[in-house]
Structure formats: C-alpha cells, structure tokens
A protein has these predicted regions:
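Residue-level signature for tetratricopeptide repeat
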Residues: 3, 10, 43-45, 79-83
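Active-site-proximal binding-pocket segments
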Residues: 47-58, 66-74
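Solenoid-like repeat scaffolds
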Residues: 25-32, 59-68, 94-103, 137-139
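Long, ordered, amphipathic alpha-helical scaffolds
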Residues: 78-161
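Short, charge-rich amphipathic alpha-helical segments embedded
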Residues: 26-47, 106
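Short coil/linker segments at helix-helix boundaries
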Residues: 1-15, 33, 39, 95-100, ...
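Structural motif corresponding to the intra-repeat A-B loop/turn of tetratricopeptide repeats
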Residues: 14, 49, 83-84
C-alpha cells in the first residue's frame, strides 16, 4: 500500500495526473477505511486540477462524508466557495474549518510564512497540521479566483471581534 501511494505521488509530481488519480482511487478501493489518509491527498489533487465534480463525490461519499479532520473541512470549504461563493453554506463551512484548525487561515492567506519542509509529527488542530496542509494544498487554493482574498477578509473580521 505504501509503495502504491509512493507511486501515486511520484506520478503526480511528474505531471501524470490521470495515472496518479487512478492509483489513489485503487488504494481507497483496497483500503476503504483509509488508515493512510490517502483521501486527503486525493482531495487536494482533484481540487488542484479543478475536477470539482469528482471532488464533491469524494467529499460526500458514504465512507468519508462525516470526516471531521481539518484537511477535509478546509477542502470542503474550498469546494463550497467554488460552488457557492460567499454564501451562508460557505460561511458555515468556514466556521467548521476554523474550529478544526484556526491556524490554517494564517498560512493560507500568507499572514504566516509556511516553511518548505514537513513536520516530523502532526498535532491535530496544531500549527504543524496547518503547515503540512498548506504545503500540499496552496496551489489548489490559489487557482480559485477570490478565495484567498475572501478568506483573508473573513478571518480578519474574526480577529477584530
């Protein structure tokens, strides 16, 4: 499973996106409980190449729709903004995402600089979790017109309360 994951990641980095996605999906079929966290990587990949229908299917799949990990909630926020813009639904997604990890906003908006290395361990809700997510997901976020500016506006309002 780890070898197949490594292959999927290498294929992605070499620009062979369809082959990479196929490997990610294969891993999830072989291991639907996904103790490797492959769904998080797959979701970011789908967002990065704007396969939003496929991303929506993954996020809402019966296996993972109730996932409350920060990576999942922040990627749900991205999709909600793509689909609905600054809507009540998107604002609810933002609230849930901030509750899961409020550090994400600072790194996604550039208020804090992301080091170019991954942490050795991840603390749920911690800055290290935020840094790792942003290292993987920033390209997807930057491809959505207005999303980072919207996040900056929404979270700066929260800071002033």
């Amino acid at each position: 499973m780890r070898a197949k994951l490594g292959l999927a990641q290498c294929l992605w980095l070499s620009g062979r996106y369809d082959e990479s996605l196929s490997n990610y999906y294969d891993i999830l079929k072989l291991n639907p409980n996904d103790n490797q966290g492959v769904r998080y990587l797959l979701a970011i990949c789908l967002a990065e190449i704007k396969k939003y229908d496929d991303l929506e299917k993954l996020l809402n799949s019966k296996e993972y729709k109730d996932d409350i990990m920060a990576e999942w909630l922040w990627t749900k926020l991205l999709l909600s903004y793509v689909r609905s813009g600054d809507s009540s639904e998107t604002n609810i997604c933002l609230k849930k995402a901030l509750q899961a990890n409020h550090y994400m906003a600072d790194y996604l908006t550039g208020r804090k600089k992301v080091p170019q290395y991954y942490s050795d361990c991840i603390t749920i809700g911690g800055e290290d979790e935020a840094r790792c997510y942003v290292l993987d997901a920033i390209d997807a976020w930057e491809k959505v017109d207005g999303l980072i500016e919207w996040l900056k506006d929404k979270t700066s309002l929260n800071e002033n309360k």
